[in-house]
Design a protein with these regions (language model features):
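A short SAM/SAH-binding and catalytic strip from SAM-dependent methyltransferases
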Residues: 50, 55-82
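Conserved SAM/SAH-binding beta-strand->alpha-helix loop
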Residues: 23
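Conserved class I S-adenosyl-L-methionine
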Residues: 76-78, 103-121
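A short glycine-rich, Lys/Arg-flanked "PGG" loop and its adjoining helix->strand segment in the class I
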Residues: 81-100
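Class I S-adenosyl-L-methionine
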Residues: 112, 116-163
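S-adenosyl-L-methionine
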Residues: 30-63
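Short beta-strand element of Class I
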Residues: 8, 15-18
Length: 163
């Protein structure tokens, strides 16, 4: 957990970054790496993103990266997916004008879900609706993004043949 966040923090030492993770061993591992590398511009939160965004100030975010949220592939579980109209409304409220959301998943059907939900929300402008498969470059991207490191979940999805 957190390799992309760690790389981003190193690339942008003047940014204050906030990571959201529920997996406690992943948090511990990332905290250890941050301390070893003396990176001080990252804070971590161990509660669901929906609860965090409900508490953030309006217009307080300039960029949000959501990489490999649980795709909940079974239809009866789709209501558990992070990218939902209510969450997007919270996210929109927290973002300042011109802010960017970057998304990635290794599930093609979830990628389509993300694009459709972003496109339907009046507060977001879809920069690109291009969906690339895991074998494409950059891999598993949903919305146009800059260069980023491959995440553990992205590599796992590629090994398992997820599209």
């Amino acid at each position: 957990m957190g390799f992309e966040l760690l790389a981003w923090a190193q690339q942008q030492p003047d940014y204050q970054l906030l990571g959201v993770e529920l997996y406690q061993p992943g948090i511990g591992s990332l905290l250890s790496r941050l301390e070893n590398l003396q990176i001080t511009n990252v804070s971590l939160v161990d509660k669901p993103a929906q609860r965090l965004f409900a508490q953030l100030d309006e217009g307080s975010l300039s960029q949000v990266r959501i990489f490999f949220p649980d795709p909940w592939p079974k239809k009866r579980h789709h209501k558990r997916r992070l990218i939902q109209p209510d969450f997007l409304q919270q996210l929109h409220r927290c973002m300042h004008n011109g802010a960017i959301v970057r998304l990635a998943t290794d599930w093609a059907e979830y990628a389509q879900w993300m694009v459709e939900h972003i496109a339907e929300h009046i507060g977001f402008e879809l920069i690109s609706d291009e969906i690339r498969a895991a074998q494409d470059e950059p891999s598993a991207s949903v919305i146009a993004e800059d260069v980023r490191d491959v995440t553990k979940f992205e590599a796992r999805g590629e090994r398992l043949g997820h599209e």
